[in-house]
């Protein structure tokens, strides 16, 4: 399988990352990947403990990594894995212009749009301000917000971890299901298909549900009905990622997730080079 694991983070560039680019590339080679990408956090709406925004200097990022790029589409047998330079855009309406500008001004191979804050709160630190009603109500609002982000950031290539907020809900059984937000999911998927944006399967959520909520591996997998509905509506652009922030997270439970997806008929995962869509 020609697999490109594009959503990963590095120490220094992402405040919550610790791995180096060398470690990431070594892990990619060990795993036999076709390619790997970096996509560090660019969340102008989030603040670190000192009050500074959760962003990096894109000019310095390009100076550090752009010349190291290797296009997976040009990879030959025996070559090391491809290496792509992307960005994860933390969306909120008030920072929309900032996000549009950064991907206009810098030649990222791909951009990932994501929601990390909701109602101006971080679910990791202020869950009590987010999960204030039944899960179906919270998840409906969340998915509509993700749909808003996909609609606004039409130029973004990938919509990240739709199930991110299931990681931090106080309920023991917090896995996100299609039945939680059917109309919102349908709206999101239609927007994504219109924009030719890929749906990300984020193995980080699988790992989080197992670690935080004691889910069995098979039960932590993405909801089958969500994926079936995306396909039913005409969606066929999938990516799968480790969302690794630390060395030990690279490929963690990736093979099991791939096997699960294969059982649903999902066997092809796309990637983006110079913002152009590639299929295996």
Q: At which residue positions do the language-model features occur?
A:
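Hydrophobic residues within beta-strands of alpha/beta enzymes
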Residues: 36-38, 111, 159, 199, ...
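A metal-dependent hydrolase metal-coordination microenvironment
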Residues: 2-144, 246-249
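Divalent metal-binding pocket/active-site signature
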Residues: 18, 44-45, 52, 106, ...
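Histidine/acidic residue-rich metal-binding segments in metalloenzymes
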Residues: 57-67, 71-75, 82, 103-105, ...
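Charged catalytic cores and adjacent phosphate/nucleic-acid-binding surfaces used
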Residues: 1-10, 21, 166, 172-280
């Amino acid at each position: 399988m020609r697999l490109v694991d594009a959503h990963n983070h590095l120490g220094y560039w992402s405040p919550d990352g610790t791995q180096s680019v060398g470690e990431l590339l070594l892990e990619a080679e060990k795993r036999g990947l076709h390619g790997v990408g970096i996509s560090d956090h660019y969340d102008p709406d989030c603040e670190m403990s000192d009050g500074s925004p959760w962003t990096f200097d894109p000019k310095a990022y390009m100076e550090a990594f752009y010349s190291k790029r290797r296009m997976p589409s040009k990879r030959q047998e025996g070559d090391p894995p491809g290496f792509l330079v992307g960005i994860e855009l933390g969306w909120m309406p008030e920072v929309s212009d900032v996000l549009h500008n950064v991907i206009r001004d810098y030649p990222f191979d791909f951009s990932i749009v994501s929601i990390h804050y909701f109602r101006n709160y971080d679910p990791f630190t202020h869950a009590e301000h987010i999960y204030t009603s039944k899960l179906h109500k919270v998840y409906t609002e969340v998915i509509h917000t993700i749909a808003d982000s996909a609609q606004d950031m039409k130029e973004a290539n990938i919509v990240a971890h739709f199930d991110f907020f299931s990681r931090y809900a106080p309920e023991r059984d917090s896995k996100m299901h299609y039945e939680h937000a059917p109309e919102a999911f349908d709206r999101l998927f239609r927007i994504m298909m219109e924009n030719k944006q890929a749906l990300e399967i984020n193995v980080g959520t699988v790992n989080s549900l197992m670690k935080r909520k004691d889910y069995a591996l098979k039960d932590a997998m993405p909801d089958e009905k969500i994926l079936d509905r995306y396909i039913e509506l005409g969606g066929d652009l999938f990516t799968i990622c480790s969302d690794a922030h630390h060395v030990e997270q690279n490929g963690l439970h990736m093979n099991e997730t791939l096997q699960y997806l294969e059982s649903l008929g999902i066997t092809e995962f796309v990637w983006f080079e110079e913002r152009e869509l590639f299929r295996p």
